[in-house]
UniProtKB/Swiss-Prot annotation:
It comes from Bacillus cereus (strain G9842). One of its GO terms (biological process) is queuosine biosynthetic process. Transfers and isomerizes the ribose moiety from AdoMet to the 7-aminomethyl group of 7-deazaguanine (preQ1-tRNA) to give epoxyqueuosine (oQ-tRNA). The gene is queA. This is S-adenosylmethionine:tRNA ribosyltransferase-isomerase. It is found in: Cytoplasm. One of its GO terms (molecular function) is S-adenosylmethionine:tRNA ribosyltransferase-isomerase activity.
Length: 350
């Protein structure tokens, strides 16, 4: 399948550069995955689309301030490091710029020596394995010296770090936020609980592969990046109860979707406690096994994320919805507006 089938025209001014002042004031497009019918709402209207017995699945990963600026100890040359994945102990898979200046044995100093890293291995596309040394607690030092790794399409400076975290972020380890969750406030989540909507939590640590463009000409040639996920026994039991009682499982974001579909694929359609690495790639033709609905942002043209949404809601429906979003001047990408996709997605007054 040609990746150009997932292209659409997006004016640059529709790429949201800063978050809205209030999380829940973003707009919400509601898309019926069967008919392609569209409704234009505000995010707080999600209360009218979720019902008693439904379950929202939220990714409680927390974004690391994963971008570090340091200098080579021997020359003083500036080096930028992006933490991608913790391997063992203090060894990390990273991206460095400029990569040609960092070879095996190179020592990089951050914060006037408060944190140091030695290159212990190299990989393609600027990848380097670094081993860190420090006194104290690594994540406290990272919190002091690191910057939030905003996506490349965001040019503005983020004034408040917390706006690139969900209000329920807990498990540190992501290089990017699970952005569909950024629309929820604690008050909105409380209102959903009062209505009888269950909340279930999983963890998937988002990698930078999320932003890597598909370089292959066809979908089938593309290889997905792997990301770590975890689902507890408590969450699995809750989701199975919801299913047994006829409720809907609504995932918040493509990361929650990937987690549930990975587990269901690996366990004959069943949801159970599990953890591991997933490189699941969902595009049209994929049969969903776990979810009934999806809350997600508006994604990049030709990205694996728009392919996932197209697998769930039909490519023609999704591209029509995206073109409608452009016409109606929705805000796109990480700090942009949201979409709720489900069957028979109609507002109810209850």
């Amino acid at each position: 399948m040609d990746i150009n089938l997932f292209d659409f025209h997006l004016p640059e001014e529709l790429i949201a550069q800063v978050p809205l002042e209030d999380r829940e004031t973003s707009r919400l497009m509601v898309l019926d995955r069967e008919t392609g019918d569209i409704e234009h709402k505000h995010f707080t209207d999600i209360l009218s689309y979720l019902h008693e017995g439904d379950c929202l699945v939220l990714n409680e990963t927390k974004v690391m301030p994963a971008r570090l600026h340091g200098v080579k100890e021997d020359t003083g040359a500036h080096i930028e490091v992006l933490l991608l994945k913790q391997e063992e102990g203090d060894k990390w898979e990273t991206l460095v710029k400029p990569a040609k200046r960092v070879k095996e044995g190179t020592v990089i100093s951050f914060g006037e020596g408060k944190l140091k890293a030695t290159c212990t291995g190299t990989a393609d596309q600027g990848g380097r394995q670094l081993e860190f040394s420090y006194d104290g607690i690594f994540y406290e030092i990272l919190d002091e010296l690191g910057e939030m790794p905003l996506p490349p399409y965001i040019k503005e400076t983020l004034e408040d770090r917390d706006r690139y975290q969900t209000v329920y972020a807990k498990e540190i380890g992501s290089a990017a936020a699970p952005t569909a969750g950024l629309h929820f406030t604690e008050e909105l989540l409380e209102k959903l609980k009062q209505k009888g909507v269950q909340l279930a939590f999983i963890t998937l640590h988002v990698g930078l592969g999320t932003f890597r463009p598909v370089s292959a000409d066809t979908i089938e040639e593309h290889h997905m990046h792997a990301e770590y996920y975890h689902m507890s026994e408590e969450t699995a039991a809750l989701l199975n109860r919801v299913k047994e009682n006829g409720g809907r499982i609504i995932t918040v974001g493509t990361t929650s979707t990937r987690t549930l579909e990975t587990i269901a694929t690996d366990h004959n359609g069943k949801l159970c406690a599990a953890s591991g690495w997933t490189d699941i790639f969902m595009y049209p033709g994929y049969e969903f096994k776990a979810i009934d609905g999806l809350i997600t942002n508006f994604h990049l043209p030709k990205s694996t994320l728009i392919m996932l949404v197209s697998a769930f809601a039909n490519r023609d429906n999704v591209l029509h919805a995206y073109n409608e979003a452009v016409k109606e001047k929705y805000r796109f990408f990480s700090f942009g507006d949201a979409m709720f996709v489900a069957s028979h997605a109609k507002m109810r007054n209850k």
